């Protein structure tokens, strides 16, 4: 008898806590209204370099395929020089050089060992919006997608529909 009363009291307490939690719940951030596919066209600015971008919810920071990474100093700060290449539907390759200040460095650890990468700010267009976001730089030549969009950027862009691709047409004019 005592055991039944104890479990009934526990059930009532838990029920009131859950109801109170549901009643008092407010989202911590507004829900983005746009929906995008798990792969979208993106444009690196300046230069209007268009490439396929994979929405990578497993990565916190976005990553860009960068060739010829060359660190250097400017005004006592760490900078990096690199090239970004794109290939259009006719297999024409376009390349553009960039110089960016290194805002931080990250060390990634995986099955292949330790990988140190510079992080820079880059402007990117997805759909009709331009975002200035942090990107790790790495030669991703062996990877299918030259551009990975991480969770920090996805939070600004919208929700991902994993059953769709190329939902948002590029409409940036900068």
Regions found by a protein language model. Give the residues of each.
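N-terminal secretory signal peptides that target proteins for export/translocation
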Residues: 1-3
């Amino acid at each position: 008898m005592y055991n039944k009363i104890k479990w009934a009291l526990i059930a009532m307490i838990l029920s009131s806590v859950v109801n109170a939690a549901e009643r008092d719940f407010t989202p911590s951030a507004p829900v983005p209204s746009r929906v995008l596919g798990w792969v979208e066209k993106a444009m690196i600015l300046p230069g209007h370099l268009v490439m396929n971008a994979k929405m990578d919810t497993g990565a916190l920071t976005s990553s860009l395929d960068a060739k010829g990474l060359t660190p250097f100093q400017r005004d006592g700060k760490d900078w990096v020089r690199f090239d970004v290449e794109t290939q259009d539907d006719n297999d024409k390759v376009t390349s553009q050089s960039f110089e960016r200040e290194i805002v931080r460095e990250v060390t990634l650890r995986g099955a292949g060992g330790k990988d140190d990468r510079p992080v820079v700010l880059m402007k990117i267009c997805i759909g009709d919006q331009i975002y200035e976001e942090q990107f790790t730089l790495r030669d991703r030549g062996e990877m299918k997608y030259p551009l990975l969009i991480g969770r920090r950027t996805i939070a600004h862009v919208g929700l991902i529909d994993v059953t769709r691709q190329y939902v948002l047409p590029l409409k940036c004019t900068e």
